[in-house]
Amino acid sequence: MDWHSFRIAALLLTSLVVLEVNSEFQIQVRDHNAKNGTIKWHSIRRQKREWIKFAAACREGEDNSKRNPIAKIHSDCAANQPVTYRISGVGIDQPPYGIFIINQKTGEINITSIVDREVTPFFIIYCRALNAQGQDLENPLELRVRVMDINDNPPVFSMTTFLGQIEENSNANTLVMKLNATDADEPNNLNSMIAFKIIRQEPSDSPMFIINRKTGEIRTMNNFLDREQYSQYSLVVRGSDRDGGADGMSAESECSITILDVNDNIPYLEQSSYDIEIEENALHSQLVQIRVIDLDEEFSDNWKAIIFFISGNEGNWFEIEMNERTNVGTLKVVKPLDYEAMKNLQLSIGVRNVAEFHQSIISQYRLTATMVTVTVLNVIEGSVFRPGSKTFVVDSRMEANHRVGEFVATDLDTGRASTNVRYEMGNNPENLLVVDSRTGIITLRNRVTMEQYQRLNGEYKGTVLSIDDSLQRTCTGTIVIELSGTGWVPGSDGGGSSSGSGGNRDPVTNGYQGTSTVGPQRVTGSGGVTSSGGGSGVNNTPGRQNPLDEPEPEPFDITEDNVHFGPAGIGLLIMGFLVLGLVPFLLICCDCGGAPGGGAGFEPVPECSDGAIHTWAIEGPQPEPHDGITTICVPQMPPGNANVIEYIDNSGVYTNEYCGREMQDLGGGERTTGFELMDGVKTSAAPEICQEYSGTLRRNSMRECRDGGLNMNFMESYFCQKAYAYADEDEGRPSNDCLLIYDIEGVGSPAGSVGCCSFIGEDLDESFLDTLGPKFKKLADISLGKEIDSYPDPDSSWPPQSTEPMCPQSTEPLGSGYPPISPHFGTTTVISENAYPSGPGVQHPLPIPDPLGYGNVTVRESYATSGTLKPSVHFHDNQQASNVVVTERVVGPVPGADLHGMLEIPDLRDGTNVIVTERVIAPGSSLPTSLTIPNPRETSNVVVTERVIQPTSGMIGNLSMTPELSSAQNVIVTERVVSGAGMSGIAGTAGLGGVGGIGSSGLVSTTMGAAGTGLNMGGTATIGHMRSSSDHHFSQTIGSASPNMARSRITKYSTVQYSK
């Protein structure tokens, strides 16, 4: 548009406005008077309208009082008369009340409160102008007040989660769902314009969906949806008003999209081929399991498979049954297979789904054949009649034994006539026919009579059985004979007496009742014979009656013995003989008791065995076997009257265990020889020689016992080892269980010794004594210091009666001299030797400080007087050796005894590790003249032993130690004080010799003598000593204490002082 035309248009518009405002129209209206028929003209003049100020718009959610007055009304009538203005409507006199008010004089309308556009989009105010009488001067005026919208409401989705679904492999841009969201702000306004956007997708591999930002429609982005990969997608969609502007409000919602399955996966079999084997003539309901793999949704028609035969099953031998729950097909055999006809079958099978394939893969589907190789296994089938029925013709001219025909069974394996079967007649009406058991030739038993012909009604039907004994199988063939011709000879029912159907003839029914047994089967019939082989019986012709005067035949049984001894019976018989042959072997191996000392046998369980000394003679668990003593060599006894004692002493047999004893009276008279097995210690069968002498004998190492006393060598070894163990253990622990004596005030009282009393409570705990049995009563009395009769009179009933068998004792007179001991019993000395090497593996004791210095040793001895000596007490080796009681008896000297003794010990360097063992021994008439202790092996551990024997007169004893042992580290001191009745004097000497030097051995010798009536005693002790270290433990066991030793008392001293 050019400028000239615009000027013309603006001029015309201005002229129109002026004309419209300033022009005045005058209209005349004719008024017809109907009464007089005149017409009157009225002149109507158009006047200028009164001016009204329009109402201003109000903004919601704000205070609009600053815009008051929002409107003003005015009537032209106010120029002539007073006018009152009033308003009404919503927000004034209708809810919500009081939003608008008016000035009745001026007509100004004001707003007084905040308004909400979503509640009231606009207000209509009805305005009126009234005069003084309340009459309307003007027509009511409608004044509209619009509420301006602000963006105060976010979008709202109609659902929290939108559900949708779509098929897999769908085309791109396929609609999936449409979202719906609303905004409460003013419609068709920017505040209510919503824009949609997908902000998140799960799984988030690649975006699959798009959304229309205006309409909210969700569509597929491509055609790659695959249910087998992801069956469900989750989207989060955001809706924002103001068309998605940054200043808009937003809301979010979820979308769940399910991918529907389609048949887009071709099924296939788990295996590419199958090989199966089946026996011929066998039917299988589950020959092989064929599993189908399909990736489509399970249990749907897209997943369910159908397996079908492509080729190879032309004879319909097989069927495939599908399991819809597992998608597994079962191949079944429904018709038997014949190995002779087909040895192998090649089946070709295919698979497809119940549902049709999807259009996306229908062009890709190709039928794939899976081969199933069936191997038919040959079995021994036996025989069968082919054909199963034969018909022959017999006329009246055929005599007995006439050949009717041949009915032979065919071997299914070879297709030829069977040669290993036998034939028998099954159902044989009138007993008419006979069959050869080998050839199967059928002949007439007798000539057919008229009566038989009439009963058979001109036709014979019977059965032939083919029996294979090796396979236990039977087949049946049917024989049909047509009786033709005339001239049947009359007869008295010949041959029918033994017929299978000629049993008890019923005159009422004109039938036959009887039983027939052929082979292993029994056939019972009524009015005919029915064979178990499948043959048919023929009843008599109805209406044909038998003569009433004919005698009734008795029931009959035709039985053929077919009993044979099978392989199972032979096997059971052989097994029975084997079991019977095994019984003597079991009786030999069964240990029902053994000879005494023979090893095997039942051992009696000792009573109250808790706390007993076990068979291995030490406390604690059973020790490992030592290589030191593996065998016991028992020397043969010398013949004649040789010195038995000397021979035994020099034999060099060392053992700590005994299993027998032999009692021998060497003074003349009788010899009592016995052999008693001691199972309690479990050693070899060497007897213990226990001697009781009435005279004076010389013996070096043989232990003495009275009436078969204790195994003293074993007891000494046991208690010595226990003493050493206690001493070693005591050296490694604090001295909280010893009486601490300090003679010098202020000396030897370390501050640390005060705290040892904290352990007294545990040491004084004697609650364990409540659980000890009666066997420990003697030990408890000893611990309490009670007076105990240590030497009771010998029991006249000893030895006790043993429940085990013993060798009989023999009594025979003795001549001069000593007879030899039977060599088969053997002899065993009682000398013990235990070697304990002091190597680096031995635990070293901690040294005990000597506060009094070296060489200051004092020994105090005290003696008490007593009456005459009491006999000694001996404890015999119990066979179980479970309870051992050791007693101690202290016997003092007689009044007037003068005891003298002297002990000289040079300075002992590191001589603090000293063990003093005291043994108190009571003498008897059976003491040997001398006691000899064998030299122990080289060791670094020594024992101090003190032996006191009751003196009767003066005793002089001295002990001297050579200066060479001044630097000895471990010293053994042995003192023996002996006495006897009527002694004139006692002299004892002790010598201690040693060689100074590293690794040398020291020697300690003590010799004690006693003179009395008929008693001479001498003793020597030789102990090896090694000065290798001062820290070695005491580990050497020293033999020879005393045969009557009752108890060993072990005391540990840090300093030993000796004085007279």
UniProtKB/Swiss-Prot annotation:
One of its GO terms (biological process) is homophilic cell adhesion via plasma membrane adhesion molecules. Residues 490-560, 792-811 are annotated as: Disordered. Residues 24-49 form a propeptide. Desmoglein repeat repeats lie at residues 835-861, 862-891, 892-921, 922-949, 950-978. GO terms for cellular component: cytoplasm; desmosome; nucleus; plasma membrane. Expressed in epidermis. Residues 510-519 have a biased composition (Polar residues). Residues 589-1060 are cytoplasmic. This is Desmoglein-1-beta. It comes from Mus musculus (Mouse).
